[in-house]
Structure formats: structure tokens, C-alpha cells
């Protein structure tokens, strides 16, 4: 039981071995002699193969028994389930384990391979064979003879030969028994140290040889098996004579070692025994006991006399490693001596290793057949190498003789797996003869070899291979169908059906080609057109007949050779190009694109213009069209010609296309208001008008086209209470709220019209006067209110120009602060000095003005000089303008220093109204509506003067001193005091309607061109106490060719401006935008518009009109104002008898005011000049010039007429001397006449570019010269009368009306002034019909002057 328990425990421990190891062992226990098909075990369960992770297997799991070829296995295994069964072969333990010592277990070993290779395992199964009682114990002989001396004592024991039983354990010999012993003998069983049971015969009675010498009985032996087996032998006992002494061995146990290769006859050992007897009884005989095995008896020889043991036959340790020799020494007596000789045969490397091949892959005729596509590590066979030698002599290694795609992997001791180490390739090697070598570790080593044959089976693992990797073929287009192009071929490295190839076209092959499946010939079956397809790229397939079939492909490139069968093709049948009219000559108009489907020279197209058109050129290669002319849309809006395209083929082809070039207008015109026609018109709005009612519609037109002519309207000023709103597209002005009592009166709405042109939008502004009242009872009164309203600034509510960034340099701020401080100190000093000088006159004038808001002086004293200086860019211009001193000087050509023609006036002008924030009508230039009939009839005295044009800009001679001849664009208008052209100022926002019959005359005018204004960095140094500005206008000297007049008189008007007036760089009127100074970020604002909202301040002072005292010298103005009023008052009182109520309101007419005539050279003549331009003009004109600033010089009436200076004729004439200071001087020239003629000069400059000049005289006839300039034409009107010049009077009989050429300036000229002088289109020539000189012969007569 202990043996079985140990066996089962060992089996369980082996079963716990982890399965995924490369090799495992499994033990089973079976009994011998088991019948066939007995289930021994289940590997699938016993090895716990369910623990293997699930894998995708190429084949199902298989259990394969590995055994040596020719062997008959004792067991079998089910390949699918792994169940183990017995076979029909007999399991005989005694036969299987014959050479194994009886005390060792008997095992039967087999190997099982678990397939496929993905889960390959090699399991060694050991079957422990259990013994059964299938053998009976047997005595060495059937008759046992033994001799016993007759004198043997009772209980003497004599050893009997032992029985032998092949079975082991309990099934071996267990008991001996004597049968029919007659009680003389007994039997005893003893156990030897080796475990054997030895029977001993016991003498129970005294023996007497004479009485009986022989006893015969039976000896029975029994085993312990079930069923129990036994056998008997005849025991014959002979009684012999008495032998007193027994032999004795010197050594009872002897152990010797002898090598197995000891030769025959070699002495093993010699036994020595002695006997005390003498004679025959002393002779000792040596013999082997019957217990010595037959093998030992065969191998060893015992000399019976000498006791020498020698080798009888060659020893073999591998057969029997040790032998037990039981030797008996007998002297003839019945009690022989016993000695045990143990012979150990030592190992000698006398055995070569053996190679045992057990195939996992079943061989065919001793040859393993492997497919060439088997995976790596495929197990082929289990190689077992053994060596019967021991220790190092029995340690064996196995290997192959050369490099092959196989390898031996050790799995168990002296066991190796032969597996594939590389992929097999039938095409490279079809068979392998593997030589296996096994060598032991002996000295010298012994080796053994064995051959293993493997044959590779061909698989379809090679696809066909084309002989060419890329096939290129060329063929001309327009071919004939059926032409053979090329032949393709491929080879297959496989054999048999796997190497048979068929050809076919790939799926991308076009239908124009076909292919022979056997020969591989490629043929064109259709006509090819290179223009449709210039090349073909497709594949040809080669497929073998393997299972599954393999294919390969080759790319075929068929290029089509071009033929010139196509004409050039234009991308469009007709080309339309749009170019701006300012495109420079030789600029790029457009690109003509031509294609030719052909190739090479056949597609090389050359372009040309047909009909020899010299206006344009075309690049023959690129197709770029360039003009040879300058475009003018007004002359020609489009050009049409044809372009020819010709290819370069041997037989060339050509085609043509029509080209049309359209000239596109540029945004060079700003919107022009048509309704209202001027700033002086108004519209009645009834207080009962419902909100949402359209009360007025403004209409502006733009001469541009497209988006440049799209006009949008907006209200940018005057609408402080948001009472009105305007539709930006229609221009409809809508009443937004119900009018109440506080809304009654005149509302001035500043409307801006801007176009949508790019890149810069242009705009114009107009004042819309909306009179909220129940009715209009006195149109003349309303017109006067409108006129006065135009002189006041318009409160802004939106921006119309960009404002310069408020951030500035700290240095500039510091300099401005210092300059402002110095300016304030200087102004205070000047104010104190002037007030001290004029205190008496100012007090008298103040008393006369207490009872009236404003009064109009007699027409002869209505002279105003207004000047609006153009400025390119200005910053923070104040609304109030301060003009203190004007000096009008008249000089002759022959008497430059004449004192009689020099009159100096001190002109006080108050710039702010002292009540409720209103603007003083005195300080702001007025603009009357041109169609005021009642005022025109009231004042009728006018003197015709020749009309002329002057340049729009003033040249800069020096920084502080400017002597300028008035440009042709600044004309003077002399009209009645309140007529279509106001005596104080022309309408700056509308087209002037000053037109009168005029007498034909010639006007010699001096025209001075000047370079364009450049921006000058304004100095921050404080100005002097006052600044003198002189404006010169003088007739042009007679040309040498004429030689008529030797000298011409000149008039010098000198403006003395205090330092405080430098605070502003802008005029106070609504000047039209100057063509030469308009910028995209700075625009001129209308009359009285607050400039500081749109420009940076150009003076150290930060005060504005809203402060209540914008000018630091405002304290000086009242004194000057009083002085002026004192000079006017006597004249008004003198003419009071003829004055009417209307005269008191609108000014005196010719009927009521006829003062005594004054001499031409008299110093009593009072002249006044109002300058609506803040100094220094020399810098403002270049640095702070807003667009379209009007320069105005006006001799005007006494206060409260806006910006007027009274000219008093009745004695005593008041003369005020003006302080003359160093430059900057702004100089202009005015036509100056001596009293009693009332003289006035005004520049009427309303947008667009409306200019007028008028000189009015009193007696003997009212004569007017007016130049009216509208957008596209100017008119000149003259009435018959006397024209009083600087040195005489000229008579003009009748008037002639003419039209003047319009003057235009482009946007680019406004933004980027050129170095050339501004071009002026001359006016129409006027021919004088009648000329007269009343007195002085040297009075200049204005003549035609060709520009």
C-alpha cells in the first residue's frame, strides 16, 4: 500500500505542472496483462487543457502518439479526445522489466504530441506497471539432493536451495513446507539481507546411517498472491559418516570491482578456506551455490580447488552492472562453508549513442512530406538519443551536420524535437536529407548518426512574374483599328498546374484595347484621339492555375502621338474688359487666354491683333493687352477689335475672338445738391403737421456712375432736438415729433450727401432752413432771418470728418502750453493799449446801439471785405473769429509811396453774442438767398466791373510775410446791400444767382501761378502783439507787345490781426471744398460750424466758443466796436429825413442817403476790411487748411451787420490807423474807389465752386459787376453805370452776358498735389462794347486777359 500511495502522489504532482510549458510529464498506473481497449486516462482533462487561452487554430486540436518506427505500442490514444486505451499487445511486466532489479518499479514510457503548432505540447506519459500473480515459485531443480552426517545434532539446520518467483512483492515466494517428512526432519524459512526467503532443513531426531541412509520427501513452496500459486520438489537426504570439522572461509563477504572491458580469464578474486581435519576430510572443494544466477555462472568461472574466480565471458555493465556470487566450501562433509562475492562491473565507454526517431508527422516510405507553406516551428519528429554507458559516458548530445531550415530543440533528457526553423521553399530546395549526429561525453567520445529524409511539397505560393516591370508603347492618333502594340510575358516559379499562366486585361483597361489570354498580345481595337485622351495607363494581369490561383500585374503606358488636327480655342468667344479711365498708357488691360488641344509645336499659339489696330498691343505669348493710348470715357466709352490665335503646326490652324474694352468711370465727382438750390432757401412747416409727415426732400445728384453715383443722406448738424429725421436713400426729411410753442421759428438742418464711391467717398453738405410757423406774412423778413441764420454756426450732432487722434507727444503738449501762456500775456497787453486809445469812441458807439439789435448803414458805406483762406488740414478751429485791424493801401505804378491812396482803419469785430448763446451777427459772414426780390429792389446802386477768375491758392513767399495776388477762383461780387448777392458775403452753400446785364469790356488781370501747398510744421512760438496781413490785387502789367499802358495802380489791403486771433486756423464761413486741398480726413465745414469738433486745435489755448469767451482778447472787442459805431452814426442822422421804415430795418437806399462827394485822394474816406480767416495764414494755408475754405475780403456796413466795418463819409471822417507788424502777412488786392461811391468787395464761394465778385457804387448810376460761378458754368452780369477805379471812373453802357468754362479738379489732385501749378480753365472772353474814362487818364481799364 505504501508503494501505491507514493505512486499516486507522484502522479498528482506531475499533473500540477503548468500546461503551457514546452514539455510535460504525465504518469498513469496500469496492471500487467490488461485486456485490450481498457481506458487508462484522458489527457484533455488530466492535463487541464481547458486552461489554455482561446486561440484561433489552423486545425483542430490533435493528440498524436509518438513512437519508434517498427515498435508495437502497448497503448493507443484518441487523436481528437486525448483518451488513452490499451491495445491487443500483452503487457508482461516480467518481460518489460527483466533487467531491472526486483526492488525497482517497472515503467513503460511513451510520448504524445499535442497539435497544431499554435498549441504544440510534447507530453511524456509514464505507465507504472503493477505486478500480478501470474507466475508460480519454482525450485531450481525438481529433485534436491542433500547429505547430512549421521552424527548431526538435533535441531541442526541445513540450507536448501531456494525457489524463484518472477513476481515481486506479495506475489513472490512467501512460504516453504515439507511434505511427508516422517517427523525426522523439519523446515525453517529465514530471510536474507536482500529480502530473499531461504528454506533450512532441521534435524529433529538422531540419524543412524546403518539403520537408514536415505530419506525422500517433498518440499513445497508458496507465494502470497491471489490466487496463491505453489510448486514442489523432491528432497532426497543422504546420511553420511561423521565429519568432525567444517571448512571455514577466511572472508565471508568480498566485494570487488572490475571494468566491463576486462578480458576473459582475468582474475576477479580468490577465496581462501581452511579445514582442521586431515586427510581426505581436510580437502576443500569450492562451488557456486544453486542461488547464483545463470548469468553469473555464465560470466564467471570458479576454480573448485583453488577458489579462484575468473572471467569466463566478456562482461557487459549495461546488461548486468553487478553480480552476487554465493560460493560454498565443502570438505566432503554435510556442513559446507558459505562466502558471498559481490562483483561490481564498472562502466567503460564501450557503447555508442543510439538515435531513436519517433515521427510526429507520419512518414511515407520513411520520408516525411512537408508542404512548403507550413508555418515556422512545425514539429516533425521526436529524436531520442541514448547511451548505455553511465555518467559522462552516457551523456549524449544530438545535432545536425550542416545548416538546414530545421533545428533540434531539447525537451527532455536526451530527447529533442526536430522542427522547422525557416520557411520552406519548394522552388529553392525540393528535398532534404538530414543527418542527425549523437555523441557521448566519453573519452574518447563515441558518436552515432542517423538519416532523416524530408520531401517538400510544392504549393501555389508564387505568383506569375512579368519579364518587364513597366511596359511603354507609343502610337499616333487617328490609327487604324486592329494594330498590334506589344506582347507581354510572365513566368511562374511553381511547378505543374501552378505554373500555367493565363493573361487578361485589368479592370482599369479601356475598351480601346484587347489582349490574347494565351500569348499576351496587346491590340488596339478602336481609333484613338489624343485630344480626348493623350495617354492610357492600365494594367495587364497574369493568373496561374493553382488553388487558389495567384495573380500579378504589370502597368502598361500607351502614349498617343499628337497630330495637328485642332485649331486654337479661345476661352471665350468674346472678351469684355473694364478699365478705369485713369489707366496709364501701356498699363495692363486684361489677359487673353487661348488653348490648343494639340501638343508641342501644334499647340504653340501666337496671338496678334487683326486690322492693324495701333491703339492696343497684345503680347504674342502671354496674351496681355496693353493700351497705346490714354483713355477718356467722355470721348470714347469702349473699344472693339479682334485677336487672332495661330498654332505652330506644320500646317498651321488659327481662330479669332472679339475683344471689347469698356472704360469705367472713377469716383471724381461729389454729390451736388439740386434741392435746395442754396442755403438761403427755406421751407414752411406748420406747427399742426403730424409726426411722420415728410416736410421737405433734399435731392443731390452725382455725375459719376454706378456705386460712385449712389447718394446717401444724413443729418449732421442743426437738429439738436432730433425734431427731424431724414431717409438716407430718398432724402425725405420727416417730422418726428409734434411741434410745440418752443419749436416755433427757424430750424437750420445741416444735411450731408455722400456717395458710395471707392476708395474714398465724396460728400457735400447743405443747410435746409425749416421755418416752423402758421404762415409766412413777410417773405422779406423771413429771407433776412434766413440770411442772418446762415451767418451763425450750426450746432453739430454727428461727425462728418475724421478727428485726429487725441494722443500726442508730451513735448508738443508742453510747447503748446508755453505758447498759449505767452499768447495770453501778449493779448492782454495789446488789449489794454488799444482800449486806452479808443475809449472815447467806444463809449459813444455803445450809447447809439442800446435801442436796436442791428442796423443797416447807407449803401455808400456798405462795404465789406471778406476773405476765406483755404487750409489743407487744421486742428480744433474755434467757431469765433477775431479780426481787429484792416489797412487798405492803394499804390500806383508811378507813385508807390502815395499817402493819399493809403487809408488805415481800425476795425473792431465782436465774435460772440452776449445773449443766450447766440452768435453775434457782426462776427459771422452772412449769406442771403439769391432770390430776394424785395431787397434787390431796395438797393439798386451798383457799378459794373469786369468779371475775372483767380487762382484758388495763395503762394507762400516766406513764413511770416505773404504778398498774394488773388487767384482766379476767388472772384469779387459787388451787389446791392441786400440783393441776390449779399454785400457781406456770397452764399457759401448754394449756387449764386447774381446776374445782371453788363457792358462789354476787357479785363486785364494779373495771373500768378504758384506751386502746390506743402505741409509746413507750424511753429509753436508765440506771435507778436499783432500780425499784419496784406492781400494784394493788382492789374496785370501790359505786355511788351501791347505797349499801351505804362503803369497800373495797385491796391494793398493790410490786415492787422492780434495774437489772440491766431487761435483759429479756419475761416468763419461755409466755404466750398477747395479742389486743391481736399483730403479724405479733413473737410471744410459750413458757416459758423464748430470746427473744434473735427480738427485739432492749432493754438495753445483750449478754449472754445462754448466757453462763453473763446478769444482771450474778447475784452478788447467792445472798445473797437464802439469806435466803429461812432463813425457811422453821423451819417445815419444826416440822412434820416429821407429814410423809410424799411430803410431802418434793411438799410438805406439811394433815395435817402446822398452824402457829399469826397475827393478821390481825401483821407476822410473810411475803408473797412473784414478778414474771416484766423492768422497766421501763411501757416494755416499749408498746415491747417480745411477743404474749400473761401477767402473773402469785404467792405461792409456798420454794425450790427455781420462782420462789417462802417465807412463814414460825412465829416469829420474817422480814420483809424492800423498797427503794422512784421510778417506773416496775408496780402490781397481789392478794387478801391474813392467816395462818394460805396465800395464793396465780396467773394461768394458756395459749393460747388460758386464764386462771385461785386463792386457796388452809389452815384451817378448803380453799377454792378458780378461773377457767378456754379458747378459747370459761370455768368457775368454788368449794369450800365460808372465804374470808379483807383485813378478814375469808367463808363459802361450796356451789359453782355457770357458763359465761362467750368473748372474741375480731380480727387487725386486734391489728395496728392503735384509739383505743377494748378491748371485753370480760362473764362470766356468778353469784348468791351463801350468804354469811358470820366476823369483820370491813368485809371486802369479791365481788359480781356488770355490765360
From Swiss-Prot:
SUPFAM superfamilies: Cadherin-like
Function: Potential calcium-dependent cell-adhesion protein.
InterPro entries: Cadherin-like_dom, Cadherin-like_sf, Cadherin_CS, Cadherin_N, Protocadherin, Protocadherin/Cadherin-CA
Entry protein name: Protocadherin-11 X-linked
Domain Cadherin residues, every copy: 26-139, 140-249, 250-355, 362-466, 467-570, 571-673, 677-795
Protein source organism: Homo sapiens (Human)
Glycosylation sites recorded in the entry for this protein: 27, 48, 54, 344, 553, 773
A GO MF term: calcium ion binding
Keyword Transmembrane: yes
PROSITE patterns recorded: CADHERIN_1 (PS00232), CADHERIN_2 (PS50268)
Amino acid at each position: 500500500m505504501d508503494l501505491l500511495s507514493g505512486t499516486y502522489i507522484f502522479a498528482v504532482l506531475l499533473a500540477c505542472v503548468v500546461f503551457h510549458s514546452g514539455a510535460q510529464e504525465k504518469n498513469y498506473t496500469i496492471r500487467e496483462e490488461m485486456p485490450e481497449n481498457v481506458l487508462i486516462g484522458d489527457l484533455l482533462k488530466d492535463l487541464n487543457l481547458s486552461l489554455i487561452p482561446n486561440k484561433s487554430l489552423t486545425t483542430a486540436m490533435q493528440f498524436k502518439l509518438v513512437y519508434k518506427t517498427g515498435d508495437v505500442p502497448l497503448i493507443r490514444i484518441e487523436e481528437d479526445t486525448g483518451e488513452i486505451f490499451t491495445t491487443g499487445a500483452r503487457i508482461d511486466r516480467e518481460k518489460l522489466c527483466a533487467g531491472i532489479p526486483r526492488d525497482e518499479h517497472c515503467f513503460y514510457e511513451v510520448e504524445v504530441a499535442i497539435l497544431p503548432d499554435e498549441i504544440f505540447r510534447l507530453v511524456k506519459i509514464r505507465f507504472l506497471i503493477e505486478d500480478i500473480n501470474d507466475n508460480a515459485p519454482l525450485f531450481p531443480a525438481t529433485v534436491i539432493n542433500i547429505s547430512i552426517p549421521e552424527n548431526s545434532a538435533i535441531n541442526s539446520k541445513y540450507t536448501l536451495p531456494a525457489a524463484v518467483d518472477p513476481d515481486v512483492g506479495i506475489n513472490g515466494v512467501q512460504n516453504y513446507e515439507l511434505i511427508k517428512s516422517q517427523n525426522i526432519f523439519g523446515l525453517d524459512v529465514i530471510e536474507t539481507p536482500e529480502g530473499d526467503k531461504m528454506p533450512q532443513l532441521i534435524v529433529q531426531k538422531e540419524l543412524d546411517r546403518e539403520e537408514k541412509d536415505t530419506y525422500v520427501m517433498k518440499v513445497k513452496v508458496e507465494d502470497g498472491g491471489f490466487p496463491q500459486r505453489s510448486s514442489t520438489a523432491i528432497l532426497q537426504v543422504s546420511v553420511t559418516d561423521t565429519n568432525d570439522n567444517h571448512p571455514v572461509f577466511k572472508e565471508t563477504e568480498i566485494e570487488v570491482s572490475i571494468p566491463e572491458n576486462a578480458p576473459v580469464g582475468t582474475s576477479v578474486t580468490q577465496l581462501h578456506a581452511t579445514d582442521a581435519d586431515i586427510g581426505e576430510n581436510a580437502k576443500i572443494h569450492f562451488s557456486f551455490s544453486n542461488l547464483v544466477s545463470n548469468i553469473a555462472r555464465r560470466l564467471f568461472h570458479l576454480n573448485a580447488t583453488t577458489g579462484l574466480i575468473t572471467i569466463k565471458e566478456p562482461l557487459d555493465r549495461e546488461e548486468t552492472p553487478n553480480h552476487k556470487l554465493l560460493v560454498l566450501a565443502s570438505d566432503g562433509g554435510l556442513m559446507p562453508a558459505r562466502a558471498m562475492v559481490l562483483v561490481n562491473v564498472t562502466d567503460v565507454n564501450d557503447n555508442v549513442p543510439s538515435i531513436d526517431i519517433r515521427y510526429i508527422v507520419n512518414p511515407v516510405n520513411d520520408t516525411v512530406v512537408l508542404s512548403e507553406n507550413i508555418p515556422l516551428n512545425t514539429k516533425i519528429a521526436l529524436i531520442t538519443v541514448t547511451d548505455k554507458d553511465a555518467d559522462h559516458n552516457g551523456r549524449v548530445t544530438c545535432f545536425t551536420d550542416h545548416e538546414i531550415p530545421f533545428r533540434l530543440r531539447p525537451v527532455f533528457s536526451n530527447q529533442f524535437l526536430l522542427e522547422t526553423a525557416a520557411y520552406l521553399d519548394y522552388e529553392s530546395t525540393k528535398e532534404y536529407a538530414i543527418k542527425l549526429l549523437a555523441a557521448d561525453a566519453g573519452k574518447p567520445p563515441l558518436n552515432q548518426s542517423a538519416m532523416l529524409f524530408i520531401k517538400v511539397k510544392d504549393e501555389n505560393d508564387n505568383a506569375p512574374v512579368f519579364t518587364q516591370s513597366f511596359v511603354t508603347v507609343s502610337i499616333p492618333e487617328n490609327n487604324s483599328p486592329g494594330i498590334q502594340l506589344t506582347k507581354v510575358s510572365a513566368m511562374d516559379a511553381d511547378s505543374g498546374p501552378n505554373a500555367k499562366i493565363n493573361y487578361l486585361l485589368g479592370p482599369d483597361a479601356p475598351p480601346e484595347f484587347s489582349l490574347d489570354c494565351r500569348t499576351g498580345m496587346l491590340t488596339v481595337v478602336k481609333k484613338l484621339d489624343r485630344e480626348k485622351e493623350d495617354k492610357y495607363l492600365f494594367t495587364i494581369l497574369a493568373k496561374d492555375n493553382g488553388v487558389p490561383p495567384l495573380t500579378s500585374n504589370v502597368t502598361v503606358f500607351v502614349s498617343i502621338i499628337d497630330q495637328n488636327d485642332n485649331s486654337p480655342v479661345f476661352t471665350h468667344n468674346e472678351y469684355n474688359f473694364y478699365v478705369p479711365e485713369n489707366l496709364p498708357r501701356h498699363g495692363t488691360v486684361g489677359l487673353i487666354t487661348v488653348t490648343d488641344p494639340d501638343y508641342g509645336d501644334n499647340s504653340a499659339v501666337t496671338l496678334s491683333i487683326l486690322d492693324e489696330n495701333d491703339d492696343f498691343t497684345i503680347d504674342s505669348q502671354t496674351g496681355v493687352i496693353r493700351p497705346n493710348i490714354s483713355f477718356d470715357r467722355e470721348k470714347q466709352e469702349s473699344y472693339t477689335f479682334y485677336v487672332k490665335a495661330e498654332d505652330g503646326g506644320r500646317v498651321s490652324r488659327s481662330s479669332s475672338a472679339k475683344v471689347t474694352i469698356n472704360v469705367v468711370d472713377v469716383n471724381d465727382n461729389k454729390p451736388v445738391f439740386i434741392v435746395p438750390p442754396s442755403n438761403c432757401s427755406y421751407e414752411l412747416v406748420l406747427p399742426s403737421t403730424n409726426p411722420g409727415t415728410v416736410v421737405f426732400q433734399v435731392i443731390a445728384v452725382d455725375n459719376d456712375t454706378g456705386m460712385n453715383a449712389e447718394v446717401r443722406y444724413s443729418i449732421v448738424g442743426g437738429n439738436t432736438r432730433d425734431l427731424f429725421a431724414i431717409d438716407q436713400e430718398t432724402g425725405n426729411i420727416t417730422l418726428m415729433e409734434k411741434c410745440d410753442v418752443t419749436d416755433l421759428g427757424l430750424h437750420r438742418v445741416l444735411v450731408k450727401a455722400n456717395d458710395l464711391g471707392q476708395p474714398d467717398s465724396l460728400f457735400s453738405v447743405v443747410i435746409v432752413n425749416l421755418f416752423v410757423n402758421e404762415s409766412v406774412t413777410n417773405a422779406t423778413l423771413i429771407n433776412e432771418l434766413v440770411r442772418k441764420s446762415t451767418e451763425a454756426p450750426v450746432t453739430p450732432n454727428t461727425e462728418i470728418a475724421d478727428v485726429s487722434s487725441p494722443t500726442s507727444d508730451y513735448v508738443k503738449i508742453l510747447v503748446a502750453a508755453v505758447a498759449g501762456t505767452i499768447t495770453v500775456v501778449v493779448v492782454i497787453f495789446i488789449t489794454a493799449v488799444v482800449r486806452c486809445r479808443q475809449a472815447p469812441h467806444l463809449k459813444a458807439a455803445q450809447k447809439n446801439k442800446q435801442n436796436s439789435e442791428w442796423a443797416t448803414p447807407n449803401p455808400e458805406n456798405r462795404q465789406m471785405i471778406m476773405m476765406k483762406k483755404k487750409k489743407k488740414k487744421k486742428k480744433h478751429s474755434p467757431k469765433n473769429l477775431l479780426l481787429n485791424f484792416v489797412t487798405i493801401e492803394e499804390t500806383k505804378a508811378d507813385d508807390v509811396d502815395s499817402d493819399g491812396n493809403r487809408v488805415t482803419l481800425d476795425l473792431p469785430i465782436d465774435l460772440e453774442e452776449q445773449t443766450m448763446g447766440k452768435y453775434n451777427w457782426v462776427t459771422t459772414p452772412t449769406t442771403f438767398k439769391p432770390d430776394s426780390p424785395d431787397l434787390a429792389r431796395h438797393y439798386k446802386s451798383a457799378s459794373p466791373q469786369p468779371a475775372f477768375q483767380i487762382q484758388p491758392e495763395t503762394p507762400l513767399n516766406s513764413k511770416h510775410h505773404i504778398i498774394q495776388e488773388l487767384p482766379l477762383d476767388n472772384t469779387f461780387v459787388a451787389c446791392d446791400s441786400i440783393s441776390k448777392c449779399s454785400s457781406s458775403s456770397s452764399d457759401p452753400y448754394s449756387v449764386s444767382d447774381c446776374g445782371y446785364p453788363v457792358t462789354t469790356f476787357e479785363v486785364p488781370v494779373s495771373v500768378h501761378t504758384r506751386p502746390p501747398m506743402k505741409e509746413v510744421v507750424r511753429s509753436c512760438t508765440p506771435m507778436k502783439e499783432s500780425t499784419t496781413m496784406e492781400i494784394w490785387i493788382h492789374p496785370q502789367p501790359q505786355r511788351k507787345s501791347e505797349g499801351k499802358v505804362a503803369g497800373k495802380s495797385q491796391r494793398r489791403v493790410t490786415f492787422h490781426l492780434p495774437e489772440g486771433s491766431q487761435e483759429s486756423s479756419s475761416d468763419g464761413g461755409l466755404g466750398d471744398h477747395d479742389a486743391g486741398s481736399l483730403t479724405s480726413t479733413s473737410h471744410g465745414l459750413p458757416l459758423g460750424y464748430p470746427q473744434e469738433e473735427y480738427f485739432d486745435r492749432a493754438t495753445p489755448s483750449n478754449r472754445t466758443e462754448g466757453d462763453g469767451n473763446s478769444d482771450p482778447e474778447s475784452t478788447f472787442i467792445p472798445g473797437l466796436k464802439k469806435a466803429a459805431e461812432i463813425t457811422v452814426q453821423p451819417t445815419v442822422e444826416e440822412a434820416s429825413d429821407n429814410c423809410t421804415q424799411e430803410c431802418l430795418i434793411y438799410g438805406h437806399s439811394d433815395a435817402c442817403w446822398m452824402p457829399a462827394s469826397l475827393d478821390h485822394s481825401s483821407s476822410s474816406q473810411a475803408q473797412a476790411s473784414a478778414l474771416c480767416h484766423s492768422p497766421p495764414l501763411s501757416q494755416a494755408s499749408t498746415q491747417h487748411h480745411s477743404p474749400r475754405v473761401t477767402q473773402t475780403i469785404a467792405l461792409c456796413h456798420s454794425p450790427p451787420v455781420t462782420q462789417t466795418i462802417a465807412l463814414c463819409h460825412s465829416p469829420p471822417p474817422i480814420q483809424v490807423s492800423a498797427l503794422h507788424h512784421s510778417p506773416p502777412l496775408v496780402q490781397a488786392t481789392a478794387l478801391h474807389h474813392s467816395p462818394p461811391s460805396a465800395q464793396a468787395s465780396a467773394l461768394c464761394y458756395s459749393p460747388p465752386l460758386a464764386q462771385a465778385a461785386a463792386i457796388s457804387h452809389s452815384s451817378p448810376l448803380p453799377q454792378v459787376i458780378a461773377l457767378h460761378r456754379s458747378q459747370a458754368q459761370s455768368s457775368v452780369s454788368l449794369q450800365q453805370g460808372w465804374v470808379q477805379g483807383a485813378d478814375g471812373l469808367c463808363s459802361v453802357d450796356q451789359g453782355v452776358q457770357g458763359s465761362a468754362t467750368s473748372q474741375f479738379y480731380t480727387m487725386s489732385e486734391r489728395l496728392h498735389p503735384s509739383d505743377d501749378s494748378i491748371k485753370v480753365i480760362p473764362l470766356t472772353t468778353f469784348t468791351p462794347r463801350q468804354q469811358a474814362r470820366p476823369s483820370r487818364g491813368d485809371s486802369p481799364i479791365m481788359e480781356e486777359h488770355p490765360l
